[in-house]
Regions:
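Short, solvent-exposed amphipathic alpha-helices that sit
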Residues: 39-54, 136-143, 169-189, 204, ...
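Extracytoplasmic "Venus flytrap"
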Residues: 26-46, 50-54, 59-71, 75, ...
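Periplasmic-binding protein-like
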Residues: 29-30, 81-89, 107-111, 161-162, ...
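Structural motif
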Residues: 58-80, 195-216, 232-235, 259-260
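Beta-alpha junction/loop-to-helix N-cap segments that form part of ligand/metal-binding clefts
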Residues: 64-131, 229-235
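Venus flytrap/periplasmic-binding-protein-like
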Residues: 109-119, 225-272
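Hydrophobic alpha-helical segments within soluble ligand-binding/sensing domains
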Residues: 69, 128-157, 205-206, 255-261, ...
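Hinge/cleft segment of the Venus flytrap/periplasmic-binding protein
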Residues: 162-165, 170, 277-329
Length: 329
């Protein structure tokens, strides 16, 4: 009996030691589609923070396309990683990502963009951490309307330019939420004009906005809606090119970190502000959830919606960015 007890104790000690060794050497991946974007740099920074706090190593890999994504999963497996968080470059890669991860017995959490299957249906079996796109869009519309009222614009001389990218689910939910909030506040639906952009960057939105502006020379004041800072900035640049003054334009972006140089300009522009979401929360939370899943077998919820957002303007952007650890970017 004494020998048996000692044997049990030895087994228990070995288990504890192997668990602590696993925690010491635990590696988890964090793959992002656009590492040059401040949003993803911040996610990486806070994934690292979670790693330091909880005791695991974060392997950060850029995955700008499908081939690099699948190669990155091979690399993670070769380095002994037990799972990864990913913002995929293409949601339709979802099935391939999941299949490859399963082949290596790795856990997967999607962040920012939801996987879809070959038929374009959301893969809701994969845990997802995501910005509350509709709610943030609604907030954009509410803030635009509030600032318009503050400036005392005549609604009959005003219009909304919504620069859309409806093929992207997140973009569609943001711009639709914004337009719905404007209508709910009392802005006339007939004065809300939509124009699709070929790309969600400044040049694409600039071209889209120019095509809209020439169709409506009667409009004296524009509210600009877009899915991110760059699309709204493209719209603002187009209005400047058509001779509009900053006081006659209100653009509010979404992202915040991409608006810093604009909000830092000596003179105010038509870009009034941006809704700063929480890449810090996304990076930390998704990594923490993956760690708990791998190390403690605590399966994460299938959907974690992040609603934290703050309006940053010329008056408060430095202070608000500092609060999120984004100061100096």
């Amino acid at each position: 009996m004494h020998k048996f007890t000692k044997a049990l104790a030895a087994i228990g000690l070995a288990a504890v030691m192997s668990q602590s060794a696993m925690a010491e050497n635990l590696k988890l991946g964090f793959l992002v589609k656009q590492p040059e974007e401040p949003w993803f740099q911040t996610e990486w920074k806070f994934a690292d923070k979670a790693g330091k706090d909880l005791g695991f190593e974060v392997i950060k890999i850029a995955v700008p396309d499908g081939e690099k994504t699948l190669n990155a999963i091979d690399s993670l497996a070769a380095s002994g990683a037990k799972g990864f968080v990913i913002c995929t470059p293409d949601p339709k890669l979802g099935s391939a990502i999941v299949a490859k991860a399963r082949g290596y017995d790795m856990k997967v959490i999607a962040v920012d963009d939801q996987f879809v299957n070959a038929k374009g249906k959301p893969m809701d079996t994969v845990p997802l951490v995501m910005m509350a796109a509709t709610k943030i869009g609604e907030r954009q519309g509410q803030e635009l309307y509030k600032e318009m009222q503050k400036r005392g614009w005549d609604v009959k001389e005003s219009a909304v330019m919504a620069i859309t990218a409806n093929e992207l689910d997140t973009a569609r939910r943001r711009t639709t939420g914004s337009m719905d909030a404007l209508k709910a506040a009392g802005f006339p639906e007939k004065l809300i004009y939509q124009v699709p952009t070929k790309s969600n960057d400044i040049p694409g939105a600039f071209d889209a906005a120019n095509s809209m502006l020439v169709q409506h020379p009667e409009v004296k004041h524009w509210l600009i809606v877009g899915m991110n800072d760059s699309t709204v900035l493209g719209g603002v640049r187009a209005t400047e090119g058509q001779g509009f003054k900053a006081a006659d334009i209100i653009g509010i972006g979404i992202n915040g970190v991409d608006a810093v140089s604009e909000l830092s300009k000596a003179q105010a522009t038509g870009f009034y502000g941006s809704l700063l979401p929480s890449p810090d929360v996304h990076g930390y939370k998704s990594s923490e959830m993956l760690y708990n899943w791998v190390a403690k077998d605590v399966e994460p919820p299938k959907f974690t919606e992040v609603t934290d957002v703050v309006l940053i303007t010329r008056d408060n952007f430095k202070e608000e960015l500092e609060k999120k650890g984004l100061g100096g970017k």
